[in-house]
A protein has these predicted regions:
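Conserved nucleotide-sensing/catalytic segment adjacent to the nucleotide-binding pocket
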Residues: 1-35
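Conserved NTP phosphate-binding and transfer environment spanning the P-loop NTPase/kinase superfamily
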Residues: 35-153
Length: 153
């Protein structure tokens, strides 16, 4: 399915990708494609933390509906993030404090796992500019997408 998507791209038009790692789930990005992604222009897209947490809550409803499964998954992070941090996450989940948990998992785990574009150990160059998205509503996303597309004719 991933290959089919790549194959359908028009090489004369810009392609926008998220600056992720060279793995997509269990799939490994081909080295030649990974190198090519690192040669592209980088735009830092920024969304406020509370809005990012809202998106997580929408996208991961299965964890909110089954908190024990989430806690079991988080237990796998004890060596990486420490017992104190994982215990705090468990407490937030047990008390139903989803906003605090989601913000913490972003700041104290997810964001720490990524290298900033332009940093010494990143494959990506420094961002050429940034794009601020004020909220996670579809109108703001559509406006941001239109703004971005207009800069890359």
């Amino acid at each position: 399915q991933l290959w089919k998507s790549f194959r359908d791209f028009d090489p004369s038009r810009p392609v926008f990708t998220e600056a992720e790692s060279n793995r997509i789930g269990r799939l490994q990005c081909p080295p030649s494609l990974w190198r090519r992604l690192g040669q592209g222009r980088v735009v830092l897209v920024d969304l406020p933390l509370k809005e990012r947490a809202t998106l997580l809550a929408e996208d991961y409803q299965h964890f909110i509906q089954n908190p024990q499964s989430l806690k079991d998954t988080l237990d796998g992070l004890r060596r990486l993030r420490g017992h104190d941090q994982v215990n705090r996450w468990h407490q937030q989940i047990d008390s139903g404090d989803w906003p605090s948990f989601l913000e913490s998992i972003l700041v104290d785990h997810y964001d720490l796992a990524y290298r900033l574009p332009g940093s010494e150990d990143s494959v990506y160059p420094k961002p050429s500019h940034s794009l601020e998205i004020p909220s996670a509503n579809s109108a703001d996303f559509e406006k941001a997408a239109a703004d971005l597309i207009s800069q890359y004719p």
